[in-house]
Amino acid sequence: MSAPAIQITGLTKSFGDVHALRGVDMTIKQGEFFGLLGPNGAGKTTTINIVTGLVFRDEGSTEVFGKDTVKDFRFTRSKIGIAAQEFSVDWFFPIEKLLYFQAGYYGLTQEQAKPKIDDLFERLGLDKKRES
């Protein structure tokens, strides 16, 4: 039996004091048509952003074709595409981590991205803001 296309278990995410997701469980089988519907603020975008790796989950697990979406980020990005309405990131990410994430979208390893990111911080005079 093949792994589900998407498997979400106990997914939890908070933004400060706001609980966006609490214990979400969901299985989407391979080949299944699926719609994620709900009112504004229900957590649809947060769920999608976590599955696609744009936002880190607080608790729980998210898998795409049996691969953890955090540990196997590149695999996930190769299997799922998303066309966002607006640029969306976890605003609690340090700037440096966000830049490494963005570099990954262009196929750069952390080792390849490091000198480019270091150069950006130096040229922009933001070296002290890496962890902001």
Question: Locations of the language-model features?
Answer:
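Short coil-to-beta microelement around the adenine-binding A-loop and adjacent beta1/P-loop entry
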Residues: 18-19, 74
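Conserved ABC transporter NBD signature motif
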Residues: 60-71, 75-76
